[in-house]
Amino acid sequence: MLNQNNQELFKPSKEFSRNARIKNLCEYYDLCDEAKEDFEGFWKRQALEKIEWFSPFSRVLNEDKAPFYKWFEGGTLNVSYQCLDRHMKTRRNKAALIFEGEMGDYEVYTYRRLLHETCKAANLLKKFGVKKGDRVVIYMPMIPETAIVMLACARIGAIHSVVFGGFSPEALRDRIIDAGAKLVVTADGAFRRGKPYMLKPAVDKALSEGCESVEKVLIVIRNNEPIEYIKGRDYVYNELVKNESYKCEPEIMDSEDLLFLLYTSGSTGKPKGVMHASAGYILWAQMTMEWVFDIKDYDNYWCSADVGWITGHTYVVYGPLACGATTIMHEGTPTYPNSGRWWRMIEEYQISKFYTSPTAIRMLHADAPDEPRKYDLSTLEVLGTVGEPINPSAWKWFYDEIGGTKSPIVDTWWQTETGGHMITPLPGATPLKPGCATLPLPGIFAEVIDEEGNKKDEGEDGLLCITKPWPSMIRGIWGNDERYIESYFSQAKKDGKAVYFSGDGAFYDKNGYITITGRTDDVVNVAGHRIGTAEIESAIAKHPSVAESAVVSILDAIKGESLFAFVVLSPASSCDLGGAIETLKELNDILRVEIGPIAKIEKILYTPGLPKTRSGKIMRRILRTIARGEEIKQDISTLEDSGVVETIVKLAKAEFE
């Protein structure tokens, strides 16, 4: 069965395109052709134009030890200098970071102030013995000090590893041990849904179970709740940093010196420490901010991601600051104190570029679909989505209600390992298609191929691979070269050479666009027909009573696999829990129209929620285990709400046993 994406195209407005950095598809293809005809020349030009080098690079790309690629060898720079110092001549009094806390507190950091605070933090880190190459684990909430400590590490050449503040002590411990961290920076706690929550006790528990490499712990006081202090190990950041000098010369860093480690989450076994290097990463962070969000000097830009994820690294901290933008940081949740929180912030801060997740969009749509109409959202110029494929109905609501049909949506595909956007529309150039990432960015050779490198025809399932290296790519897995090769360069080849496999499946549509079908382990095989769960879930979302769903496979004696749907009903749903059979028929009617008769749900279970990682990704492996009646062996400690798993297990037993 061939895949299709027959959604209508939405062309960029002529007014927006007129002033965009990339104004039309001709300009886009010109850049693509430049990269194709002179690959190294293309990247050399970008690097010379964008980065303020301390000393020039002598070699653009070193492929001698592929897939351990090296970029811009011989060049020296400092990422904090690129993000802060170089703006002092023209933007020193411009807002660099605007923070709004969960409880409504508010703070503005100009570029000058952010530089001074970064230097003070850098000097404090040095007093604690942190030097170039040392690892610093940051276990923090969404507060300005998190970004400041990241930049301070970059300034002195320390390698930071941010661990999301919602991870368990066990997950934190594993990452500290793997990185060999010398210092941990944390907070007493923060605020969520109007109430304080704690972080420091998790650090205490993690460090009580090993972590011999850790010498000291710095604690940022945020919520002022009582915490335990261990003498000689724990120190209060707020008290010490104010006494430091606001001057700190940036460390001279080689292009390939590591900037940070970021551990991939949600998987079993030892975490993978993804390594990113200084020059290539910051170059692509800046380029994608300028191209994909069409960042201008007047923009107030807001990415709602947590800094604990790669999206927060690249598109809350490093990318916006590298190009001199104003970045918004929000501590809380989108529905506290009500579902208008985000829309009020967009109105109040006059946000022009807004980047969030499909999960958040679906949640706000289901919770209060008319709430955005109470606010003036007219300042919005570009909307963006990240983290998972967005179903067309959520896309349309986002486009109509939030963007007022005038703001293009950049549906971005990328990964922790890629460092920045790979496949995405350009807001002034690319005709948009709901639920479709569209085209690779110039310089990115993303292709849908088979294991031997043959390009797939329209509608055929294939492996989404990147067949040439790029500057911001993963440099390896910390301490495990073999795992790096096995994880990313062992599944596909092109012209006899191993290429990067993303782990995602995809297909080309009739426009030549790439549609992501989801992780290759999120593909079900029904009677020999491979169907992406994202496609099924997008169709299910068209039912007016469905707020969210997750589809997994169960074993079928006849078909091999059949479909099991976990469905979360919208608050305004007319369905009742006794009407599952009726709803099942309605959903299958939709699937028959949207996909075909092969896509038929055999079992349905209404649930109050779905198990998700802290970054909003649905953990389908856990749901598959439940649907098949198997024992759960996956780690659920890193879930947003681990209690929902127990609830679903009970519901499944009551319904099907």
UniProtKB/Swiss-Prot annotation:
One Gene Ontology cellular component annotation held by this UniProt entry = cytosol
Q: Where does Mg(2+) bind?
A: H543, V546
Which chemical reaction does it catalyze?
acetate + ATP + CoA = acetyl-CoA + AMP + diphosphate
Annotated residues for binding of CoA = R192, R193, G194, K195, T311, R592
Q: Which residues form a coiled coil?
A: none
Q: CDD domains per the record?
A: ACS (cd05966)
Does the UniProt entry include the keyword Cell inner membrane?
Answer: no
User: Where on the tree of life does the source sit, at the highest rank?
Assistant: Bacteria
Q: Kindly report, in one word, the top-level EC class recorded for this enzyme.
A: ligase
Write out the PTM section of this UniProt entry: Acetylated. Deacetylation by the SIR2-homolog deacetylase activates the enzyme.
For this UniProt record, the keywords arranged alphabetically read as follows: Acetylation, ATP-binding, Ligase, Magnesium, Metal-binding, Nucleotide-binding
Cofactor names = Mg(2+)
EC number of this enzyme = 6.2.1.1
Family to which the UniProt record says this protein belongs: Belongs to the ATP-dependent AMP-binding enzyme family.
The protein's matches in HAMAP family, at most eight in alphabetical order, are given as: Ac_CoA_synth
Q: What does this protein do?
A: Catalyzes the conversion of acetate into acetyl-CoA (AcCoA), an essential intermediate at the junction of anabolic and catabolic pathways. AcsA undergoes a two-step reaction. In the first half reaction, AcsA combines acetate with ATP to form acetyl-adenylate (AcAMP) intermediate. In the second half reaction, it can then transfer the acetyl group from AcAMP to the sulfhydryl group of CoA, forming the product AcCoA.
Its protein name is Acetyl-coenzyme A synthetase
In the UniProt record, what gene is named as encoding this protein? acsA
